[in-house]
């Protein structure tokens, strides 16, 4: 979804693209914006958090892109890292709403519990639909059985490598890392789908 705003004190308008984080309902769009504070603070993300309120109007541009969920009634594996969880949340909501009758695996990696967006909601969806969930925290130990410490290890998970469709989203280095693991496990390249934040490129 394209969003255009004119941050206070800025000479020019700014346009940002955001992934949708909820299922389509024909009435509204939901985006989930992380406040960027470290390094060069996010101009638009901070403006949205600090200055935009319910009832304010912003200019939107229709969603577009080549990364979307195709309900093929095959096993589905969603693999994300960091803010790459955003479109995966929308896909999980869609799968639940459509009563997807094939196995679903949700795999996510992040720094720790404080950076784990949507954790409560995804756990609810996984439990309600009898799906599988595996999480990796790089800098935190956790007591839950489905959460591991360290780097994501796809070989440690029982995945539908022959028939599944795999969706990747996150930093490009992470997606390259995940894709190489999938290829080594025997997943066909045509069954690996991904989104790069920026101009589309091959992994």
Question: For each predicted feature, which ranges?
Answer:
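Ferredoxin-reductase
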Residues: 1-57, 96, 110-112, 123, ...
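Short, compositionally biased
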Residues: 14-29, 70-83, 185
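Proline-centered helix-kink/hinge sites
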Residues: 24, 63, 87, 171-172
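A short, basic/flexible loop-to-alpha-helix module at the beginning of a structural domain
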Residues: 61-73
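Conserved S-adenosyl-L-methionine
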Residues: 74, 94-104
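Histidine-anchored nucleotide/phosphate-binding helix
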Residues: 85-97
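Reductase modules of NAD(P)H-dependent flavoproteins
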Residues: 103-203
């Amino acid at each position: 979804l394209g969003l255009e705003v004119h941050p206070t004190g800025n000479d020019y308008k700014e346009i940002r693209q955001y992934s949708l984080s909820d299922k389509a309902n024909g009435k509204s769009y939901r985006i989930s914006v992380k406040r960027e504070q470290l390094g060069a603070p996010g101009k638009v993300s901070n403006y949205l958090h600090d200055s935009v309120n319910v009832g304010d109007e912003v200019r939107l541009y229709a969603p577009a892109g080549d990364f979307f969920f195709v309900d093929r009634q095959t096993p589905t594996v969603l693999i994300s890292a960091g803010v790459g969880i955003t479109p995966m949340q929308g896909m999980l909501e869609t799968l639940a709403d459509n009563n997807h009758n094939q196995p679903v695996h949700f795999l996510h990696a992040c720094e720790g519990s404080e950076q784990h967006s949507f954790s409560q909601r995804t756990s609810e969806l996984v439990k309600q639909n009898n799906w599988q969930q595996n999480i990796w925290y790089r800098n935190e130990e956790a007591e839950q059985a489905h959460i591991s410490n360290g780097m994501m290890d796809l070989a440690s998970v029982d995945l539908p490598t022959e028939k599944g469709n795999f969706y990747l989203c996150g930093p490009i280095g992470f997606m390259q890392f995940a894709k190489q693991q999938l290829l080594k496990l025997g997943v066909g390249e045509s069954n690996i789908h991904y989104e790069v934040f920026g101009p589309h490129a091959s992994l």
